[in-house]
């Protein structure tokens, strides 16, 4: 059944499409669009169901669909035929929970109408513009949409005739199906199947290919190496293990699980207690830290959104499946691509070399990929707090080096109970379970495909190898895992793995093989969302959001109850055996698609030997005396590795969970310059965790081992200003990217691993976890020319550490302290090597020597001094030197404070000249030629040796100097100037001024790339509005003007009375903000309970048992029918629930708070809330983008009981939403004078604002929150529950100690209830 919806594309989206069409030379057309919905059912729906369906979808059923005609062309964009979209899964869930019987599935399409004359070829070009071929189809008419619901006929497996056709038969199958088997592996399989006297099934071959792919088995890291004719003594992995063997202390799990586990602390963890009817309680327990980082490069090249999304999702599952279950906490993301070539902003260093047709352009990757990664993290509910973004594409020694195959890195940290850190052994007879989403025909052969050079595979096989993500169901699965580990020693999970490359065919065998078991599986028990899949497709597809785990049969009822409460699908698929044999039975065809010993699959296929030789790069001396230093400064600031990353950061929720202390944004202007991320371990502690990154790929072209050491060094200098203590507390993850097989690259990889291993051992560091991606080469045919782009060896180091006190973290924001000074610590000790620098890149000047960590002991000493200064509160600001050199370091510190800097490099010049011009004897001010002076100044300002700038008080100068002297680092330290808060000029002088520029002008250049991509991706008017605020310090600044004593707890008398009103912390599937909500209300003296909508439906809880209701933030049902709409309709369409909620809202003795998704949901219940007749709905942000920011709000006088104690105050608060714009279309666009506006966005001058992003969503009158007539029901889009502690705020106002101003809201609610 088709149903017609509302307009699909906003005016600016239409305009962007028309501009793209014009750029392709397409004729002018008029474009209109609308959503269409298609409901599949086995029989015709009755009138009552159709009416409900129309209300649910806000759409109208039609008897006849419109058709294209002469001059009016229809493009019906639907989910790709043969697939089921995540949107459909969630929409169908809503329909089921709303009681709509008989609906098999609901899909959504978009009808685009083009009015004008178009040829068939032009229509094909338009079709390409209108859809993503990875996930969508374009249909010519509405009748074809019926194919969305076609079911294929089931087929059995096929075999490859190795008994009759021998090795040649397998070689042919290998090529045709993209198995990526080596010649040795083909011989191994032929030998084993001939011994078994049977032919392999296609299922077994695909399973073997995935399980033994480079992606899964890391064959190169375990290989023997012969370099320059000599066999090397150790494998790559052996050298990595050496770091752990030398320094195992502080590491709990290394090399043998989905993630590494490092030592944490005993803290009070906060979660619902099943033994106390899901009451939230603190639990004192030893809690360790999970660390994991991996890459998803190949899928991101093919389909950036889906590739990055599933990269984030897979890494999250790795964390959750560590030990016997754990909780992911905070994420990191990074991207490396070739040159962007942004239209109208092509940079002078960029040349367009071309690319293969089937991979995405670097610009498309950076428009779509970050949204995919952020969207998954956002919807799952994990803050993304750290990252990097680099572009590189240069001709070097006759080869084009770059990242046509991009790096997309996803990682993070999590928390795990000490007693859950190690998996138990699976006994015979244990049940083998799939938890999470159903199988679909996506992601076939991803492990093998990602192990091949991009372009060597058939495009259709690359296409098949990419997965699609559904974070909402992964959230449900994680809730099940949480409920299990929270049972402590009653946890039913024996062992758990995530489902990744190879799908179930890799995950289940891995699960049982770890315990030395075999297994019998029933293929038709695997949950599927598509009919007609072959056994190979069922067993090997890489559908996401799945885990495999084992439990005892006696625990099945407990596990089932948890899954049903969380509405998370699961199935018992198999049973563990003690015979070491793997059998997969197919009852449909009464055969066994898999039937072989596990040791054939996971045994010891032939060990790889790598042979390579040293290829020495050509060396050119660096010279830049003829380059204008001011122009150089602006160029360097525009290079993406240096430039602002706002467009990557504000799309990602950075506060969900309420544990964030330090995100990327720093200071009262929220400038993206943080060196590292810091989280808190719990709500009752200042202990925490920190993570940082280091990567230097361009340096590897000059000296690969040096690049490895520099990566380690950068990770340390980035994390050094956090209160960690001994350097050995820091643990590293190493992700290795290389174009192995390209001459010289295997040798570089070996020597770099060797160098990093030695450096880490010298630094007392270990690498307990890592990953590799060793096919970083793109090849393609361009007409008659064969082209290739080879990535430099690329190591990414991620550092993780426990933190003693998060409050001592020092940021790059300069402080307005009279008489403060800036000290520069140069760990390059004047060498100023320029190889691989940002400066070199922006001038295509690939010359000079590579910077290096020459003495690990001196870096260790530097770290120790900074730790001492952090612990003693001697640092006002800290920023490491990295991309862009000292110039960029100082500029970013000035940007964060919006001040000037006066920097004198005389002393640096005095150190530079004896090293680089030893024969020079004159006066630099008089006798140095302009060219030599310019050359020296450029090297001093733009070299990227390790180092840092610190701001200290003048009175602490002697103490600081003494600390560096004691550490033997006096020769590294120079006083280079001071901040200037009286003007905004960034000035560098040394024997005269040579660079002086206005801060705002430099910052505009720094933010230009981010602004340009934001304009292309989002509403360009919003991007322009944000860019314009760079020069407006007054309106941009955060401040606090509170009319109450922040440190007074007005709930204290009620807490002391011992009476605890019960509050229902309400959530629906997909909600992710319940923990911090419960923690805030618990702090204010409430007795908080975890109440799922399934509990209310099943009668396990009744709202009448509670005094207050808090509806939490997140993505109920993935926001598929509009934010909060599906959640609200599951109440309104359910008579018993509707009555229960209506009675609660009518009770004069209750309070209700709805935040974010809860705000959106409660606004849709206005018809059953007394005094809410004038309320708006909340619609998509004006930017049409998810907005995560720290915004200023004002609390006007209103009837709101929970805000009563905060009236007339203004203070910063977190916002994180995609649909927060108050929309009054229901009221004819009119805002009633009776509307109870309870919260408004204001600017830095405390004026209600419409200016983006000070008003992040475009709400009229700055509306951020509203209340009903009697003030008992208050809803708001911002998140006060995430910032009720001062340490949770990215920027803490002066005078706020333990509690923030937002605690008053929760204390006010307690006071209002008496």
From Swiss-Prot:
Associated pathway: Purine metabolism; IMP biosynthesis via de novo pathway; 5-amino-1-(5-phospho-D-ribosyl)imidazole from N(2)-formyl-N(1)-(5-phospho-D-ribosyl)glycinamide: step 1/2
Enzyme class, first EC level, given as a word: ligase
Residue numbers annotated as active site: 1156 (nucleophile), 1279, 1281
Residues that bind ATP: 307-318, 674, 882
Annotated localization: Cytoplasm
Chief place where the protein resides: cytoplasm
Alphabetized Gene3D superfamilies for the sequence: 3.40.50.880, Phosphoribosylformylglycinamidine synthase, linker domain, PurM-like C-terminal domain, PurM-like, N-terminal domain
Gene Ontology CC terms: cytoplasm
GO BP annotations, alphabetical order: 'de novo' IMP biosynthetic process
Domain Glutamine amidotransferase type-1: from-to ranges: 1063-1314
Catalytic reactions of this protein: N(2)-formyl-N(1)-(5-phospho-beta-D-ribosyl)glycinamide + L-glutamine + ATP + H2O = 2-formamido-N(1)-(5-O-phospho-beta-D-ribosyl)acetamidine + L-glutamate + ADP + phosphate + H(+)
Transmembrane intervals: none
Binding-site residues, Mg(2+): 675, 714, 718, 880
Keyword vocabulary terms for this entry: ATP-binding, Cytoplasm, Glutamine amidotransferase, Ligase, Magnesium, Metal-binding, Nucleotide-binding, Purine biosynthesis
InterPro entries named in the record: Class_I_gatase-like (IPR029062), FGAR-AT_N (IPR040707), FGAR-AT_PurM_N-like (IPR055181), PurL_large (IPR010073), PurL_linker (IPR041609), PurM-like_C_dom (IPR010918), PurM-like_C_sf (IPR036676), PurM-like_N_sf (IPR036921)
Matches recorded under Pfam families: AIRS_C, FGAR-AT_linker, FGAR-AT_N, FGAR-AT_PurM_N-like, GATase_5
GO molecular function: ATP binding; metal ion binding; phosphoribosylformylglycinamidine synthase activity
SUPFAM superfamilies: Class I glutamine amidotransferase-like, FGAM synthase PurL, linker domain, PurM C-terminal domain-like, PurM N-terminal domain-like, PurS-like
EC numbers for this chain: 6.3.5.3
Assembly mode: Monomer.
Family membership: In the N-terminal section; belongs to the FGAMS family.
Functional description taken from the UniProt entry: Phosphoribosylformylglycinamidine synthase involved in the purines biosynthetic pathway. Catalyzes the ATP-dependent conversion of formylglycinamide ribonucleotide (FGAR) and glutamine to yield formylglycinamidine ribonucleotide (FGAM) and glutamate.
Protein name: Phosphoribosylformylglycinamidine synthase
Organism per entry: Neisseria gonorrhoeae (strain ATCC 700825 / FA 1090)
Lineage: Bacteria, Pseudomonadati, Pseudomonadota, Betaproteobacteria, Neisseriales
